[in-house]
Amino acid sequence: MQIIVRDNNVDQALRALKKKLQREGVYREMKLRRHYEKPSEKRARERAAAVRRSRKLERKRAERDGIR
């Protein structure tokens, strides 16, 4: 990953770096890897995330179609 510092503006370069790291999911990965996660816990977490995604998709579809 490369960030260009223009006109010695380090603050702007740091903001750009943080934004890139956020988009790449580095912070989320660091948070998950702080402690060991058992495979069963990982499966449960991923399953719960899939359920949340599917519910959100259903809500969006219902809202788009005008169904409550």
Curated annotation (Swiss-Prot):
Pfam families: Ribosomal_S21. GO terms for cellular component: ribonucleoprotein complex; ribosome. It comes from the Bacteria. Residues 50-59 have a biased composition (Basic residues). The gene is rpsU. This is Small ribosomal subunit protein bS21. Keywords: Ribonucleoprotein, Ribosomal protein. The keyword Ion transport does not apply. The keyword Ribosomal protein applies. One of its GO terms (molecular function) is structural constituent of ribosome. Belongs to the bacterial ribosomal protein bS21 family. Residues 36-68 are annotated as: Disordered. Residues 37-49 have a biased composition (Basic and acidic residues). GO terms for biological process: translation.
